[in-house]
Amino acid sequence: QKEMPRDTNYVQYKYYTAIFAVQSEYHKEAVQLLEELKDGDYEAIAVNQFLYQEYVELKDTVKFVETLQNAIKRFPKESWFLQNLINYYIFSGQEQTAIDYLAQAIEREPNVAQYHHIRGNLNENQGNYEEALADFDAALAIDPKLSDAMAGKGRVYYNQAVKLNEEAALISDNKAYKKALAEMNEVFRKSLPFFEKAHEMAPEERSYIQTLKGLYYRYKDELDMQAK
């Protein structure tokens, strides 16, 4: 059997020493070893994944973001790094940056419905309503049973109507107030069929039921469902 080069043996030894440090929760020691290995070819993806996780354990945000960004460039077909970076930006309130990275994710994997759905939620939060509707439509085109995307379309209109209601409350002129209320009711009505379809897709989802109850009550319609 052909003997492996000494350098390969050394790299393997360092890698397994790093794994031992990770498992033993010697985070600083693990980081030092993984940093020395991260640009090499031996188990390169795993090394960078472990390095990110160790920086998370050390609560070093700058370094774990940097690790993810570098790994995304080096391993463009490995979605794990991109997904973790997107999650970080979402949960840290950097929604526009998350939207930008989701565009990359969609370009790489256009047939993942959840990418479109998540971007739709973020666009809706940012007030990008047309973009949000397009994202939800794209998600449903890939997965017609994705009830959350259907409800997302309803929510786009529902939340706009809530905002119009808040604005109408500040109007003192009676004629203008009635006009604002009419506009608000029209937008609320637009949300109704999407929540009805979402309820048909997922009849046990209570958030859809509660929203529909409120909409039916608003328009004095009968609640044609079994609420549990």
Give the ranges of each region predicted by the language model:
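Short coil/linker segments at helix-helix boundaries
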Residues: 159-197
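Canonical positions in the second alpha-helix
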Residues: 3, 36-37, 70-71, 104-105, ...
